[in-house]
Amino acid sequence: MVTAYDATFASIVDAGGVDMILVGDSVATVLQGQRNTLGVSMEQMEYHVQMVAAAKPFALIIGDMPFGSYQASVTDAVTNAVRLIKAGAEIVKLEGGVHVSEQIAAISSIDVPVMGHIGLTPQSYHRMGGNKIQGRTEGKEAGSRERLIEDALAVQEAGACAVVIEGVPSDLATEITGSLDIPSIGIGAGVGCDGQVLVMHDLLGLSPRTFTFAKPFADLRNRATTAIAQYVAEVRSGEWPDAEHSFS
């Protein structure tokens, strides 16, 4: 699974052979320049889902439910899940474990597939004190190993079709995956998950900084900068447009 936020990149990602395209609320940090994902709205998520759907990809389209769109009530969760499906998503994704199991069950009950998301959940940015690795402590408190296993099982029991496991030790992600009947998709969770997801801009080397877990498979940021600098130089020198790129 790889993220995309518009038709152009959705078609590129799809041509690369991914199984799923995530229209993530990471659009807030990747495209909008925000510090975290909390500010993105339902309207913005609908807009980006519509753009990705316009590419008519073979890959499944996963629509992220943004912060505030499902936490307050089951009614909100169902209503906003339907909005994303109508915009073109085929699965909706929401963050949390035990405390959102009722929302997952309600959305699933109207035949909308739900993908869960446990571990480091970016919408819990303030409670976690930032984006910090989870599952390194024992006990029943939020973020502990035992709690994350409980969260994963609760998400499955509520009817989720898959679950993202983010930012946890690889041995814990492997243990959680082994306890589930539904697929797990890891990000910063090691090789033991059933699948993997990366933000497209990290994968392509477009991001200004690289996270430890995110391997850049290309260096498009520097290549793009070099190309633009060459364009600027040729325009300023009068070298371009040349006869080949002009009409007679």
Enumerate the predicted regions with their spans:
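Alpha/beta enzyme core
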Residues: 1-218, 222-248
